């Protein structure tokens, strides 16, 4: 229930005038195996939603030799529109109840090294997002018999490519004053492959140090 998100209720309950619901079921199968210094894992799943059945998958592999380790993998994912995406509207924003799920495939490759009390790792990843939902600016847009001017519209016309790097190094000990310390750095850059003006899709932290 909500005061402004969802479909209008036949009989309001107090300050709640809108309602919406959806049921989601998930099924996942996963298998992993080891052979000498190699480890492989794969999974497949299905999500049953009001938008239909969505199939997802993931595969990864890892190789270790002494203190060295290398890994790579890929995974497909899906994100359902939130009720805010579907129903929120204001003087400057127009909702869209016809949104569909976002879909993305993420690839990653990386490695690490550990010796005695010290460890370090680095990982590169790329996410190919399709039908990404965001608020898109339209100078003029006709919806049915209405023409709206200068508003943000909830749409999913963005094709988004995201590249990132994550690196970390640290120290760990069972004794002493300082038992552990870790330094990590992350870099992220995003390129929108659709020529539209969006509100928040490119609002992210490019560099992160902790």
Please report, for each region that a protein language model flagged, where it lies by residue.
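Transmembrane beta-barrel strands of outer-membrane/channel proteins
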Residues: 1-3, 42-46, 59-61, 72-76, ...
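Outer-membrane beta-barrel translocator domains and adjoining extracellular loop/strand segments
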Residues: 1-16, 52-57, 83-90, 97, ...
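Surface-exposed extracellular loop regions of Gram-negative outer-membrane beta-barrel proteins
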Residues: 2-6, 13-58, 61-108, 124-155, 175-185
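Outer-membrane beta-barrel proteins
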Residues: 13-19, 30, 47-49, 95-101, ...
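Residues that define the transmembrane beta-barrel architecture of outer-membrane proteins
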Residues: 21-25, 53-55, 103-107, 114-116, ...
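Residues on the lipid-exposed face of transmembrane beta-strands in outer-membrane beta-barrel proteins
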Residues: 27-33, 46, 59-63, 109-113, ...
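Gram-negative outer-membrane beta-barrel transporters
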Residues: 33-39, 126-128, 146-210
């Amino acid at each position: 229930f909500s005061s402004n998100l969802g479909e209008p209720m036949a009989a309001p309950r107090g300050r709640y005038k809108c309602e919406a619901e959806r049921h989601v079921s998930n099924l996942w199968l996963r298998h992993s195996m080891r052979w000498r210094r190699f480890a492989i894992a794969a999974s497949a799943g299905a999500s049953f939603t009001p938008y239909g059945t969505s199939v997802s998958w993931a595969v990864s592999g890892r190789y270790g030799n002494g203190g060295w380790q290398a890994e790579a993998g890929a995974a497909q994912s899906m994100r359902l529109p939130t009720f805010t995406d579907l129903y929120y509207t204001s003087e400057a924003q127009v909702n869209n109840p016809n949104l569909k799920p976002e879909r993305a495939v993420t690839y990653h490759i990386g490695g690490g090294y550990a010796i005695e009390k010290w460890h370090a790792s680095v990982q590169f990843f790329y996410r190919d997002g399709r039908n990404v939902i965001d608020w898109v600016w339209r100078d003029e847009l006709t919806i049915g018999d209405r023409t709206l001017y200068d508003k943000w519209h909830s749409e999913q016309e963005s094709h988004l490519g995201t590249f990132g790097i994550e690196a970390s190094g640290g120290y760990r000990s069972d004794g002493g004053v300082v038992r552990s310390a870790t330094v990590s750095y992350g870099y992220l850059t995003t390129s929108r492959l659709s020529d539209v003006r969006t509100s928040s899709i490119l609002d992210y932290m490019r560099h992160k140090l902790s």
